């Protein structure tokens, strides 16, 4: 899959604009200088932390429309959702966003406070059942 993406990057003349960085420990620094972050796993992720971190930094995300990333983008950047496997749609959207970056909604949905509150509520309901 990576070979296919790299070939498309070259085919569309984007090799000066897109980097494939592999596994890194300085991902926040890499993301902060990125124009777009891609989440193109063919298998759905349960939560999609990288996508949410990117959106929180103001970096738009283009992702396949499934899993936790889909839930995030529906709330924060619905235009970033692409049907799984539609790589040409990914490339075309990336070209548009390089020219004119999209606006990202403020993340009021996926916050630590809300996650903690929801988790505590689950425990409270279970305790009340007993």
Spans of model-derived segments:
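Short alpha-helical segment that forms part of, or immediately flanks, the ligand-binding pocket
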Residues: 28, 51-56, 70-71
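Conserved hydrophobic residues forming the short capping helix/wall of the S-adenosyl-L-methionine
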Residues: 9, 73
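Hydrophobic alpha-helical packing elements
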Residues: 23, 30, 86-93, 111, ...
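Acidic donor-binding loop of glycosyltransferase active sites
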Residues: 32-46, 59
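A charged, aromatic-enriched C-terminal amphipathic alpha-helix characteristic of glycosyltransferases
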Residues: 99-129
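Short glycine-rich donor-binding/catalytic loop of glycosyltransferases
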Residues: 24, 42, 59, 63-70, ...
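Conserved acidic donor-binding segment of nucleotide-sugar-dependent glycosyltransferases
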Residues: 75-87, 95-99
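Active-site donor-binding acidic/aromatic loop of nucleotide-activated sugar
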Residues: 1-4, 15-23, 30, 81
């Amino acid at each position: 899959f990576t070979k296919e993406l790299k070939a498309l990057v070259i085919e569309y003349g984007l090799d000066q604009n897109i980097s494939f960085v592999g596994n890194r420990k300085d991902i926040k620094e890499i993301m902060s200088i990125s124009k777009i972050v891609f989440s193109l796993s063919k298998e759905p992720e349960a939560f999609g932390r990288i996508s949410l971190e990117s959106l929180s930094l103001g970096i738009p995300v283009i992702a396949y429309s499934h899993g936790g990333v889909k839930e995030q983008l529906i709330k924060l950047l619905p235009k970033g959702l692409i049907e799984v496997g539609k790589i040409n749609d990914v490339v075309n959207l990336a070209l548009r966003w390089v020219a004119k970056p999209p606006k990202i909604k403020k993340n009021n949905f996926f916050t630590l406070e809300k996650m903690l509150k929801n988790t505590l509520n689950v425990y409270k309901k279970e305790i009340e059942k007993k």
